């Protein structure tokens, strides 16, 4: 059970793998996903490692598969995902896979090349068909006398005078529709108005054979006179990427050509359909297996990457690897090695040897789908130091609770809970869909956090008795007005003469006792509602904050005990807990004392806690003004201040001085430079054991004391301790004030909710007519939208970030160093989930 509250115990192990069995053994280990390989060749270039050729072959196969996948997605063919986990192919199977992928790639490339050529021919014939159809209309217009007048500028005046026959040349083609205006202006300027342009739009968009996009085009015909203008026109057409086509001059020739073009288009369409059918069959066959192929290739690539991290012994028959692994999983790792050896057919077993090392192991916290999100919250602050207390189990409760204190609303909590329950119930379907939306994936990964935040918000909403800014009168109010008339001095004239009246709980029957659960609903209509709620929430925030911080300081004790650091207990934990309890723990006691010591009859004489707390630090106790809370208060408060002040030098001086004394004593005894040699004591080398007098243990008190490789610097130690002491003492004050954000955010949420109700939904409820009922439909839609957008999303995100800050800074800095590095075992699970690149 203790492993739940701190990271797993890790060990460094050495693997001896036979060359013929190494591939299968690594495959089994990565299928298990419990080992992290260390790079034993950090100085060797990646291109000079033993298995670099195999890695390149895997990358080439991966490239071919990505090409096939791109073609499949382009054809809108669904990729079949059965969730199958294929076995890793043997190295000898790589040749067959390469040949298969090469065949599919070449076939697809050949189909694409042929299809592109066919589509280009089809496009040209289609454009020619439209040219022949449109130009007939243009030539018919040429016979119009008005056109002759319009085009008379193409002839020189002296030529017209000679009565020479009108002989115009022309070119016809197709151009993108958006280029027509610029094309026309360019022709006019370059040819100085000596050309005549006619154009008509093609109604249907045409497919580009290269990109596959559909573009709108227009047919044009340009009339000119002379070879010089003809050359200019062709140059301009070439510059605007217009396609020119031959067009017969006589109607009969155009008709015959159009007939031939239509026949060729029909034949070409048939060939295109057959080509597309063949391409679809190839892609559909590939779509059934491409996910399995991807997994196989990437598993092989991962294995060869891992083998490149290993050393090769001088005989070239054995690979040596070093791995970090959890101690509890050593047996399963041994079984995996045995399975790998059997699959490879090797007769020599692989050897797993635990190593002794002074290196800090990686941090590994076991999680499940429920605790994974909370562990990510902790890890975002910093990966825990090896074997220190893990805050995640406590964060499971404290994080959603502090969020709910700021977000307390019964109605909003229900909406948040329903959304989280929907994600939890459909998690299998959502996971299988593999949604690529980054925002939704982030929200979905925190579904259990949102679920607990919603449930706790329902609870705190009932405590505050707040549901969409309105109170729920479940048990009936405990306050009554009648006794103010029957026993008190209220009359009808009192009601008429006063705009605001205050109930007196000291009169019997006015206050019937505490509300069974939460706050009495009568406060929702009271004019002093904010005064009462602010006082309640402010004191509650201080109480919760101090309890939270004291709990964090208490957790540091378990770290000191586990790492066997008595100095940190006596000169760290004890003065820290006394300092905080003497000042702020005493404040919590005063709050509870004032709540219980003063009732309705004596509440008007209750002194101010704020004034008392300030006077406590100033040692100021005036005779008049704020009355004492209890007898002997002055002496107790002076004693607590003195104790708190004594804790400062206790934290600051004692530990550095004791460390200095221990260093000088060891130096005097000469043990620090004892000439022994440290040798790792592995389980198979019992004879290689030379133990030094001052040998260190990873869990000993001396772990933080200077070793023979270090020089003790009293100045550095003193400065470090001074920084820690100042940070803790000032942090107690600032962190306590920081917890007032619980009150501030709760107040802001309640006020926003009330404003939204008053300014939106109240308008629809106020109109008593049929039109008001119809308007309420739209008003409620606006109210629901604003509630979700502002109060649930924006306010929820704000409360989430503030709760995050309270845990990272105010809570975790009391015991959590977070200077470790994460245990990152490579697992085939990441490949199956499509996270290989991560």
From Swiss-Prot:
Residues 408-409, 472-535, 595-639, 751-771 are vacuolar. This is V-type proton ATPase 116 kDa subunit a 1. Residues 1-388, 427-441, 556-573, 660-725, 811-838 are cytoplasmic. Belongs to the V-ATPase 116 kDa subunit family. GO terms for cellular component: clathrin-coated vesicle membrane; cytoplasm; melanosome; membrane; perinuclear region of cytoplasm; plasma membrane; synaptic vesicle membrane; terminal bouton. The chain crosses the membrane at residues 389-407, 410-426, 442-471, 536-555, 574-594, 640-659, 726-750, 772-810. The modification Phosphothreonine is found at residues 250, 360. GO terms for biological process: regulation of macroautophagy; synaptic vesicle lumen acidification; vacuolar acidification. It is found in: Cytoplasmic vesicle, Clathrin-coated vesicle membrane; Cytoplasmic vesicle, Secretory vesicle, Synaptic vesicle membrane; Melanosome. One of its GO terms (molecular function) is proton-transporting ATPase activity, rotational mechanism. V-ATPase is a heteromultimeric enzyme made up of two complexes: the ATP-hydrolytic V1 complex and the proton translocation V0 complex. The V1 complex consists of three catalytic AB heterodimers that form a heterohexamer, three peripheral stalks each consisting of EG heterodimers, one central rotor including subunits D and F, and the regulatory subunits C and H. The proton translocation complex V0 consists of the proton transport subunit a, a ring of proteolipid subunits c9c'', rotary subunit d, subunits e and f, and the accessory subunits ATP6AP1/Ac45 and ATP6AP2/PRR. Interacts with SPAAR. InterPro entries: V-ATPase_116kDa_su, V-type_ATPase_116kDa_su_euka. Subunit of the V0 complex of vacuolar(H+)-ATPase (V-ATPase), a multisubunit enzyme composed of a peripheral complex (V1) that hydrolyzes ATP and a membrane integral complex (V0) that translocates protons. V-ATPase is responsible for the acidification of various organelles, such as lysosomes, endosomes, the trans-Golgi network, and secretory granules, including synaptic vesicles. In certain cell types, can be exported to the plasma membrane, where it is involved in the acidification of the extracellular environment. Required for assembly and activity of the vacuolar ATPase. Signal peptide: none annotated. It is a multi-pass membrane protein. Keywords: Cytoplasmic vesicle, Hydrogen ion transport, Ion transport, Membrane, Phosphoprotein, Synapse, Transmembrane, Transmembrane helix, Transport. The modification Phosphotyrosine is found at residue 364.
